[in-house]
C-alpha cells in the first residue's frame, strides 16, 4: 500500500492488524477463504468508480463499454464453469441472490419448503428473524434424529401435505452430499419450483467433486467466496426461460448499481476456478476435511453424521460438557478460529450452541496438508480438554505459531 499509510494511518493500521491476524491464526471458519492477489487487485481497481445500472449493452449510464466487457466475462465464465444457461453476477451477496429468486416466483404468503436452520439450513431459508420467514410461509424439513442425514421421506411427506410453490435445497452447515435429483423428483411431484443454494459447496461443484445442482434446479444461487475462493458476493444461475425475470428481480427489483469492481474480481476468481489446479485444490479441501474428521474422532470428539463428504464438519461438544460459545472463545485465545454452531436437535440457544463448525477451505489455500490436519486435531483436543489449564493453553499457542510460520500468508 503506497498511499493509505499517509492518507489515513488509523485505517491502514487496522488493515495491517487484520492481515497479521489472518497470518498468525489457523482459520477454520467454513465460510471463509483467502483470495488470490489477482482477485484483490481487481477488487481494488478503478472499476470501483463506475456506475453501471442495467446489464451489458443495456445500461442507464454512458461510458460502460469496459465494465460491459468484464461483466460479460464473469457471466460467460460462470456459465462455462457450472454448465448453466444463464448467469447473473450482480447480486451483492448470497442473501440477495436468494431474495431475487423468491421475488421471481413467489408472492407474499406463498408456502415454501426449506431446511431447518438448526439442522444446517440458512437464515434466508425461512428463519422467522429473516425477511424470508416474514414474507413467506416457510415449512421446515430437517435431518434424521439418528443419522443426521437429510430425511428425504420427510421432505416428500411435507411437500405432499403443504404443496409448496418452491422447495429450497442447500445448507450452511451440512457435511454430507445432497441428493439434488431426489429434490427435483419431489418438486415435480407436487408442482413446485426447485431452488438450490450451493453457497458452501460451489467450489467443490465447480471441480466436479460434488453433484452439480444445475441440471436439476430451476434456480441455483451461490456466494462467490467460500470454497469458490472469490470476492464476497453472490450469483444466480438459471434456465434461459427464467433469465429475464431473474435479471429484472435483481435490477431494478432489489438493487441499483452493481459493484463493478467486485464483478471484476468475480470474473478473475471464476477464471481461476476453470484451471486444472483448482480441481487439485478442491480435492485437497475434501481430503483435508476427511483427515481432520478422522483425527478429531481419535481425539474423542463426536461428529454430526459421523464425518464429512465436503469441506466442513460439525463437532457435537455435549460429551465434553462444553458449549460452542465456550469452545469458540478458548480456541480463539490460542489462535484457532472456529464458529459456534447449532447442531441438529440442539438444546442450547443459537447464541450458545452445543457445537462448533469447522472448515478446511482456507487452511488448504494456505498450503496445509494431511499432517497439518493431524496437528490441528491434536491442538483442538489439547485446548478443549484443558480449558482452565494455562500451561496447556500456552503450549497450544506456541504450536499454533510454529504451524502458521511454516505457511506465510500475504507476506510479500
Swiss-Prot record:
Keyword Repressor carried by entry: no
Site (Plays an important role in substrate specificity): 225
CDD domains: SHMT
Subcellular location: Cytoplasm
Signal peptide coordinates: none
Modified residues (N6-(pyridoxal phosphate)lysine): 226
Superkingdom as given in the UniProt entry: Bacteria
BP-aspect Gene Ontology terms: glycine biosynthetic process from serine; tetrahydrofolate interconversion
Cellular component, GO annotation: cytosol
Keywords tagged on the record: Amino-acid biosynthesis, Cytoplasm, One-carbon metabolism, Pyridoxal phosphate, Transferase
Pathway field: One-carbon metabolism; tetrahydrofolate interconversion; Amino-acid biosynthesis; glycine biosynthesis; glycine from L-serine: step 1/1
Cofactor: pyridoxal 5'-phosphate
Binding, (6S)-5,6,7,8-tetrahydrofolate: 117, 121-123, 349-351
Main subcellular localisation: cytoplasm
GO MF assignments: glycine hydroxymethyltransferase activity; pyridoxal phosphate binding
Subunit structure: Homodimer.
Function: Catalyzes the reversible interconversion of serine and glycine with tetrahydrofolate (THF) serving as the one-carbon carrier. This reaction serves as the major source of one-carbon groups required for the biosynthesis of purines, thymidylate, methionine, and other important biomolecules. Also exhibits THF-independent aldolase activity toward beta-hydroxyamino acids, producing glycine and aldehydes, via a retro-aldol mechanism.
Protein name: Serine hydroxymethyltransferase
Lineage of the organism: Bacteria, Bacillati, Bacillota, Bacilli, Bacillales
Gene: glyA
Amino acid at each position: 500500500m503506497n498511499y493509505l499509510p499517509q492518507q489515513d494511518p488509523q485505517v491502514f493500521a487496522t488493515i495491517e492488524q487484520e492481515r497479521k491476524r489472518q497470518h498468525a491464526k489457523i482459520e477454520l471458519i467454513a465460510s471463509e477463504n483467502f483470495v488470490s492477489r489477482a482477485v484483490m487487485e481487481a477488487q481494488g481497481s478503478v472499476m470501483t468508480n463506475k456506475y453501471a445500472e442495467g446489464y451489458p449493452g443495456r445500461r442507464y449510464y454512458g461510458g460502460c463499454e469496459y465494465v460491459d466487457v468484464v461483466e460479460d466475462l464473469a457471466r460467460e465464465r460462470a456459465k462455462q464453469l457450472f454448465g448453466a444457461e444463464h448467469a447473473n453476477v450482480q447480486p451483492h451477496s448470497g442473501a440477495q441472490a436468494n431474495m431475487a429468486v423468491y421475488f421471481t416466483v413467489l408472492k407474499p404468503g406463498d408456502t415454501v419448503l426449506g431446511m431447518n436452520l438448526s439442522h444446517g439450513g440458512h437464515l434466508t431459508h425461512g428463519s422467522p428473524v429473516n425477511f424470508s420467514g416474514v414474507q413467506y410461509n416457510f415449512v421446515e424439513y430437517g435431518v434424521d434424529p439418528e443419522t443426521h442425514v437429510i430425511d428425504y421421506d420427510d421432505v416428500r411427506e411435507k411437500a405432499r401435505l403443504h404443496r409448496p410453490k418452491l422447495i429450497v435445497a442447500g445448507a450452511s452447515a451440512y457435511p454430507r452430499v445432497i441428493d439434488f435429483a431426489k429434490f427435483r423428483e419431489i418438486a415435480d411431484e407436487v408442482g413446485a419450483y426447485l431452488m438450490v443454494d450451493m453457497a458452501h459447496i460451489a467450489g467443490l461443484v465447480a471441480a466436479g467433486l460434488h453433484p452439480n445442482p444445475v441440471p436439476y434446479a430451476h434456480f441455483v444461487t451461490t456466494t462467490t467466496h467460500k470454497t469458490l475462493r472469490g470476492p464476497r458476493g453472490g450469483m444466480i444461475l438459471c434456465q434461459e426461460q427464467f433469465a429475464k425475470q431473474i435479471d429484472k428481480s435483481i435490477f431494478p427489483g432489489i438493487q441499483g448499481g452493481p459493484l463493478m469492481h467486485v464483478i471484476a474480481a468475480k470474473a478473475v476468481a471464476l477464471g481461476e476456478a476453470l484451471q486444472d489446479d483448482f480441481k487439485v485444490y478442491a480435492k485437497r479441501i475434501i481430503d483435508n476435511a476427511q483427515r481432520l474428521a478422522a483425527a478429531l474422532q481419535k481425539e474423542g470428539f463426536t461428529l454430526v453424521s459421523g464425518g464429512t463428504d465436503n469441506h466442513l464438519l460439525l463437532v457435537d461438544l455435549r460429551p465434553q460438557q462444553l458449549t460452542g460459545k465456550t469452545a469458540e472463545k478458548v480456541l480463539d485465545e490460542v489462535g484457532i478460529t472456529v464458529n459456534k454452531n447449532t447442531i441438529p436437535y440442539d438444546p442450547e440457544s443459537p447464541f450458545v450452541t452445543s457445537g462448533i463448525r469447522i472448515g478446511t477451505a482456507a487452511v488448504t489455500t494456505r498450503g496445509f496438508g494431511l499432517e497439518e490436519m493431524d496437528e490441528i486435531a491434536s491442538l483442538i483436543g489439547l485446548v478443549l480438554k484443558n480449558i482452565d489449564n494455562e500451561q496447556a493453553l500456552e503450549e497450544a499457542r506456541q504450536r499454533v505459531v510454529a504451524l502458521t510460520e511454516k505457511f506465510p500468508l500475504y507476506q510479500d
